Amino acid sequence: VYPLDVPRALEKLSSIRDDLVFWSTGAQAQQLIESDQVDMAILWSGRAAAAVKNGAPFQPMWNQWMPEADTIAVPKGAKNPEAAFALINYYLGADQQAKLTELTSYSPVNVESKPNVDSVLKQFDTSTPERMKDRFPIDLGYWAEHHDELVTAYSEWLAG
């Protein structure tokens, strides 16, 4: 997959551009599938699960799904880094991750976490071994190194 063939990707997007619907917020993406305005969507699993709970006739497709990277950090020079790290450890604990999943529909990052979720949320769990093997590989180093050129190419395509 890497290095990305950006011209080829943008050429493919150009071939279907008239059929694309762009969204700017997670709420808007969820509304698009709830109101049956789109046949397929890329959106966060928690938003998709909420839409299905609200009656949207959608199901997840896990073939080369794209995980989203997130970070939690303690800034250099923080007044109380020990407390900050303690908060992060608490947040990432199995019990707290289970509660977070139950409240938000987003999968836990702690593999020891065992949230109590219904069948709809289980469909959208991104942390199962089967889902992990089917994901699209994200090379954060590549994205960091090529960030400016990738953003420029995509922005120019959007504007054109």
Model-derived features: positions:
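Periplasmic-binding protein-like
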Residues: E11-S15, G55-A78, K114, V120-L121
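Soluble non-cytosolic domains of exported or imported proteins
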Residues: P3-P7, S24, A78-E82, A94, ...
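Non-transmembrane alpha-helical segments in soluble domains
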Residues: L10-S14, Q30, E34, I42, ...
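Conserved C-terminal helix/tail region of periplasmic/extracytoplasmic solute-binding proteins
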Residues: Q31, E130-G160
